[in-house]
């Protein structure tokens, strides 16, 4: 699969495809990534912790999003392709899976495993239909509601730094065998 790994999304601002032999002209230039203050690997503990937090944020967002979650092999153990987002031509460590990463990054692996279990245990996160946000007397509230600093008042402006949402886990809404409002 083309594109940055999860680890590379938080470690590189730009692609590093020089080793591909195409003058870094291959691969997408729009990676929607942020290196957290330093390009590539670092020993700066503050940057490392920020990157790990960003990876947890991104993985959480993926697990609470509707649809089928898709991530790249190795994302759960912080696999990196060193900023190369187009490794089609490599039969080397850029594409070989490093099994030692499970031991090295056990904390992040366990976080990912727990988030997958969380998703599996909450039917409201695996709906068969899209949200519509319409209030229904039958369910007492809409399937999704949006909030800001005040309940029921989301601020969609670009200066807002707070957004929250609530999902209705009523089994009649989710179509699941059990209520998910706990």
Q: What residue spans do the PLM features occupy?
A:
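Active-site and adjacent substrate-binding regions of carbohydrate-active enzymes
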Residues: 2-182
């Amino acid at each position: 699969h083309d594109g940055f790994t999860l680890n590379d999304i938080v470690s590189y601002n730009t692609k590093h495809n020089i080793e591909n032999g195409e003058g870094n002209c291959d691969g997408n230039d729009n990676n929607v990534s942020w290196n957290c203050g330093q390009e590539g690997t670092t020993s700066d503990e503050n940057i490392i912790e920020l990157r790990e937090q960003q990876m947890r944020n991104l993985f959480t967002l993926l697990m609470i999003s509707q649809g089928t979650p898709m991530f790249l092999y190795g994302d759960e153990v912080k696999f990196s392709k060193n900023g190369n987002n187009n490794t089609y031509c490599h039969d080397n460590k850029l594409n070989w899976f490093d099994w030692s990463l499970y031991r090295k990054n056990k904390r992040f692996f366990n976080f990912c495993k727990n988030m997958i279990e969380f998703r599996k245990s909450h039917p409201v996160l695996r709906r068969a239909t899209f949200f519509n946000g319409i209030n229904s007397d039958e369910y007492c509230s809409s399937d999704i509601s949006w909030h800001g600093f005040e309940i029921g008042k989301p601020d969609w402006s670009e200066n807002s730094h707070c957004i929250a949402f609530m999902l209705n886990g009523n089994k009649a809404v989710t179509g699941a065998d059990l209520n998910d409002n706990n």
